[in-house]
């Protein structure tokens, strides 16, 4: 392993170790909200723009994941149809409401709004939309980054029921390169995925204990076909991506 790859591993491991203790109470609160939604046959929606949309894909139809999870996916806020355009789109006031209207978010649901910076128009509008519909809001975000760049703008962290601070630094990248002012090695995705999978694992453990755990199996595991088909039929009415 080279010196810089070693530094990257060490940085991510150190941040995850710190998050395990510092975020324990907040992760438990997030699990409380999601478990309550599951018991009430509600849904957990996951929204993010740019690279943050990967959290929605990570939790959707996932081996070991909850079938109540619904990703909010639209090419205009993702990267594959034009990264520059999507970066512009997420800053336009009112642009995401028509996207959210497709999903039928309602009272008792949970919306996970993922935004590392936590200040762009799209995640702010998504959180306000959820509040309007009576849904709870969980916000994985970087508090340090958001506080640095807010400059009087509304911050996602001020709108959420639960804030999951991912400890990513301003600008996301953590590694300095000798002889350059540039930084490389973004960490928000690695940290965010770990936080959310830990929360969802907590929820799953609670539901297993209560006798109703809608959890997908890997498609390559014996018996997965029948189990996954049953879950898809049960939950596809409110998940357009199944």
Swiss-Prot record:
It holds the Pfam family SIS_2. Residues 30-214 form the SIS domain. GO terms for biological process: carbohydrate derivative metabolic process. InterPro entries: RpiR-like_SIS, SIS_dom, SIS_dom_sf, SIS_GmhA/DiaA_subfam, UPF0309. GO terms for molecular function: carbohydrate derivative binding. Belongs to the UPF0309 family. PANTHER family: PHOSPHOHEPTOSE ISOMERASE, SEDOHEPTULOSE 7-PHOSPHATE ISOMERASE / DNAA INITIATOR-ASSOCIATING FACTOR FOR REPLICATION INITIATION. This is UPF0309 protein BSUIS_B0903. It comes from Brucella suis (strain ATCC 23445 / NCTC 10510).
